[in-house]
Amino acid sequence: MKLLFFDMEFANGKIPGSVFSLGYVVTDEDFNILSGPTDICINPDCEWNSYVADKILAYPMETIESSPLFPACYEEICALFADADIAVGFSVGNDVTALKKACERYKLSPIPYFWFDMERVCKRANKNRGAHGLAGCVTAWCGEAPENQHRSDGDALATMHLMRAICRDAHIDAEMLITAYPECAGDTIAPQNQQKKPKNVHRGGKNGSKRRHHRPRKKTPAQEKATAEGKA
């Protein structure tokens, strides 16, 4: 299983799809890092919220404004999601919506992927229920505050550390955690089913444990191109 931990930052919450960075870390189900942490910087092409510009932005403004627009990053982003079995975030609904809106803004095909929300897991876990926010949950579960807060690659890495800590505490791997919390998962293909248990799970693992078989996902043209290039 390949996991894509991701996080996004937005220039202006009133402008749908105003993404200025997408950070990610790719791991296997035992949390061995395969790629990243990396930030994809994007010119949001909009008026900035003053608070974001002054307090949240982790890069020089010149770096972001000289970065390519979202369409130029689209194929790279599509390839990331196509190559992963699941995308994991914290309070992932905001990121899912922003990525969808960014595609709509530039009239690009939506990116299909299966997601898992660690914030929802933390609210349902038996321990550390008093922790709030990514920093609070990481501190509670990992014993130290995350680094590079509000920088999307830093938050993606912190999300990975959080999931790893919860799995180690329960002596399970990532796939088992995802199977245990189907209500914390969803996909961007059928939004109406995002709160329902994924269909492709059955008991076929060792000792009758649940194992997930991911259903084929319809790929965008950009994803098909990325797959073809990878086989060349």
Can you describe what each PLM-predicted range is?
Residues 116-132:
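Short alpha-helix plus adjacent loop in nuclease-associated cores
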Residues 2-101, 106, 112, 139-144:
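Conserved non-catalytic scaffold segment of RNase H-like nuclease domains
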Residues 52, 99-101, 125-127, 204-213:
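Short, conserved acidic/polar surface loops in the N-terminal third of protein domains
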Residues 86-93, 97-103, 133-192:
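Acidic, Mg2+-coordinating catalytic module of metal-dependent nucleases/exonucleases
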Residues 110-114, 170:
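P-loop/Walker A phosphate-binding loop and immediately adjacent motor/lid segment at beta-alpha junctions
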Residues 74, 131-134:
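Alpha-helix initiation and N-capping motif
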Residues 114-117, 178-179:
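Beta-strand segments within the central parallel beta-sheet cores of soluble alpha/beta enzyme folds
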Residues 160-232:
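Acidic two-metal-ion nuclease catalytic site recognized across multiple nuclease folds
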